[in-house]
Regions:
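Flexible helix-coil transition and linker loops at the boundaries of alpha-helical arrays
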Residues: 11-18, 83-85, 96-102, 159-162, ...
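"A position-specific structural signal for the A-helix of alpha-solenoid helical repeats
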Residues: 26, 56, 111, 139-143, ...
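Residue-level signature for tetratricopeptide repeat
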Residues: 30, 60, 115, 143-147, ...
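Structural motif corresponding to the intra-repeat A-B loop/turn of tetratricopeptide repeats
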Residues: 34, 64, 119, 147, ...
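Amphipathic alpha-helical segments of tetratricopeptide repeats
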Residues: 49, 78-79, 133-134, 162, ...
């Protein structure tokens, strides 16, 4: 690009990726590292009005003695919106620290925080974001909320909503209430944002979950029927809520002795609606123990002992995982007991503590099996007070556990 305007135009014409500013910055960083400051400045100029490039260029010009142009670039960088600016290079910190001493403003601290966050220093990132003070920029509060826990996170999310309402702020708010099991509040916020963003299935799925957990099963199922979830790897959430709503409704109907209605709800729970973004696996890959257990209860209520026995036998024949404890294993033991095989059932339940001594779900299932309901309730309370783990921090997620908890809560 050193051969004049045409050479520069030819050079720039070959930078065709989605984020050309990042390519220029990467090249500029190399030239700067080998002492070719003029070349680095030229490359940073190619990045246009990308704030981080302007700060780095201003820093290099300052080092070269061109303070007038350097100050002009600082002013230009300060005037630009930080929207869609996501710095991550630690090498940019030196220029930003210098800029902060020359012309301090909250955006510099925000950019620094994003860099530290991208490089796994969350404590430093939060410290910098806190130092930004009260600013009129919702993504800053969204970012800061992500680094906080509990009520402090909620406070920042609410600030973000006041400044700039968007589907992202709505999703984060609903998600906070869902994570903290404040289902009624989640439903209220979900309803509000669903009206504003009716085609957004991220919000829709969280709202549907809140409707399900507040006992509004038909509204939940109706909402899911109108939703179009984009199929993607692991897109099980929609079907999980659909299944849960039908099974929760079946549990209520069993308690009301509406056995025929319960059977209809159980049958509906076995469906895999195409619009919810996930296909049905092979039958031998589906764990139907909970559905079979509820169906057995309904059949027994209708006096069909033969069908109830067949369903309980199907539960017993299910092969459980040897590597992970599943809450549905409780149903295996209970089915054995209800079939009159008490000794085998007791042996199975007593083995859980030996095979999975640290597993809290196994401990809860043991308590339920032994009729220690108060102990089981205390364990649930401890679970609810814990901070949720990220998906990659949990080696196994038990999709039946909350449903089984509800089943035995209703039974009490």
């Amino acid at each position: 690009y050193q051969g004049g305007e045409k050479a520069m135009a030819d050079f720039k014409s070959m930078i065709r990726n989605e984020l050309p500013a990042q390519t220029y910055m990467e090249l500029a960083e190399w030239y700067e590292s080998v002492g070719c400051t003029d070349e680095a400045v030229t490359l940073l100029s190619c990045a246009g009005d990308y704030p981080i490039a302007l700060y780095r260029k201003a820093y290099l010009l300052h080092q070269s003695g061109n303070d007038a142009e350097s100050r002009s670039l600082l002013q230009r960088a300060e005037s630009l919106s930080p929207s869609m600016v996501f710095p991550f290079r630690p090498s940019s910190l030196k220029a930003l620290e210098w800029a902060k001493t020359e012309k301090p403003n909250w955006k510099i601290g925000y950019y620094e925080a994003l860099i530290w966050w991208a490089n796994q220093n969350k404590a430093k990132a939060l410290q910098l974001l806190e130092a930004c003070g009260d600013v009129d920029y919702a993504p800053l509060y969204m970012s800061r909320a992500s680094l906080k826990e509990g009520e402090a996170r909620l406070a920042d999310l609410q600030k973000a909503e006041k400044i700039g309402k968007s589907w992202r702020t709505g999703f984060a708010l609903i998600n906070w209430y869902v994570s903290n099991r404040q289902w009624q509040k989640a439903a209220e916020v979900g309803k509000r944002y669903m009206k504003a963003y009716p085609s957004n299935y991220y919000i829709g799925l969280k709202y549907a979950k809140a409707l399900c957990e507040t006992g509004q099963y038909q509204q939940c199922i109706s909402l899911l029927s109108k939703m179009q979830v984009l199929p993607n790897e692991g897109a099980y959430a929609g079907r999980a809520v659909y299944r849960g709503a039908n099974l929760y409704r079946a549990m209520e109907q069993l308690n009301q002795k509406s056995y025929k209605q319960a059977l209809k709800s159980i049958e509906a729970s076995k469906e895999w609606p195409e619009n919810l973004g996930v296909g049905k696996p092979y039958d031998n890959m589906i764990d139907s123990r909970l559905e079979n257990y509820l169906e057995a209860k309904a059949a027994a209520g209708l006096g069909d002992k033969e069908k109830a026995s067949a369903l309980l036998t199907a539960i017993v024949q299910h092969k459980s995982s040897r590597s992970n404890f599943e809450s549905a294993n409780l149903l295996n033991a209970l089915a054995l007991r209800e079939l009159g095989k008490t000794q085998e059932a007791d042996s199975m339940a007593s083995a859980w503590s030996k095979d999975f001594p640290e597993n809290r779900i196994a401990q809860w299932c043991t308590a339920i099996y032994n009729g220690e309901n108060d102990k089981a309730a205390t364990m649930l309370q401890v679970r609810d007070e814990q901070t949720d783990s990220a998906p990659w921090e949990a080696s196994f997620r038990d999709s039946n556990f909350d449903l089984i908890v509800r089943l035995f809560s209703n039974a009490r």
